């Protein structure tokens, strides 16, 4: 069984670039341990002979038949954008 230690939580905190309080670390240690204990319990379930289920809902996304055709207003739409590069519209990047 995997044991969640303070060192492990500190390592994960560093990897995630978080700054947690001591109370938050203790809470995470408890939560992580509960999650890992539950996964360990699931690993003990006997699934011998059980066929894998890839999706609980069969045929959930029916696709309609396509009718490809050329979009004729392409040049009109491109005129509304300030920049174009290699036949594509160019928009500002999204930055945080």
From Swiss-Prot:
- The EC number(s) given in the record are 6.3.5.-
Q: Name one GO molecular function term.
A: asparaginyl-tRNA synthase (glutamine-hydrolyzing) activity
Pfam families, alphabetically?
Answer: GatC (PF02686)
| Alphabetical list of InterPro entries matching this protein | Asp/Glu-ADT_sf_sub_c, GatC
GO terms, biological process = glutaminyl-tRNAGln biosynthesis via transamidation; regulation of translational fidelity; translation
Give UniProt keywords alphabetically: ATP-binding, Ligase, Nucleotide-binding, Protein biosynthesis
The regions listed as transmembrane in this protein's record are none
Reactions it catalyzes: L-glutamyl-tRNA(Gln) + L-glutamine + ATP + H2O = L-glutaminyl-tRNA(Gln) + L-glutamate + ADP + phosphate + H(+); L-aspartyl-tRNA(Asn) + L-glutamine + ATP + H2O = L-asparaginyl-tRNA(Asn) + L-glutamate + ADP + phosphate + 2 H(+)
Listed under subunit, the entry gives: Heterotrimer of A, B and C subunits.
Q: What does this protein do?
A: Allows the formation of correctly charged Asn-tRNA(Asn) or Gln-tRNA(Gln) through the transamidation of misacylated Asp-tRNA(Asn) or Glu-tRNA(Gln) in organisms which lack either or both of asparaginyl-tRNA or glutaminyl-tRNA synthetases. The reaction takes place in the presence of glutamine and ATP through an activated phospho-Asp-tRNA(Asn) or phospho-Glu-tRNA(Gln).
Would you identify the family this protein belongs to, as annotated? Belongs to the GatC family.
Q: Could you tell me which PANTHER family the record lists for this protein?
A: GLUTAMYL-TRNA(GLN) AMIDOTRANSFERASE SUBUNIT C, MITOCHONDRIAL (PTHR15004:SF0)
Protein name (record): Glutamyl-tRNA(Gln) amidotransferase subunit C
Q: Which organism is it from?
A: Thermotoga maritima (strain ATCC 43589 / DSM 3109 / JCM 10099 / NBRC 100826 / MSB8)
């Amino acid at each position: 069984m995997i044991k969640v230690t303070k060192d492990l939580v500190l390592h994960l905190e560093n990897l995630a670039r978080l700054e947690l309080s001591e109370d938050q670390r203790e809470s995470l240690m408890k939560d992580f341990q509960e999650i890992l204990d539950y996964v360990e319990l699931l690993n003990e379930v006997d699934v011998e002979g059980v066929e894998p289920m890839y999706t609980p809902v069969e045929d959930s996304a029916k696709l309609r038949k396509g009718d490809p055709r050329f979009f004729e207003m392409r040049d009109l739409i491109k005129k509304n954008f300030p920049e174009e590069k290699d036949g594509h519209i160019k928009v500002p990047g999204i930055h945080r």
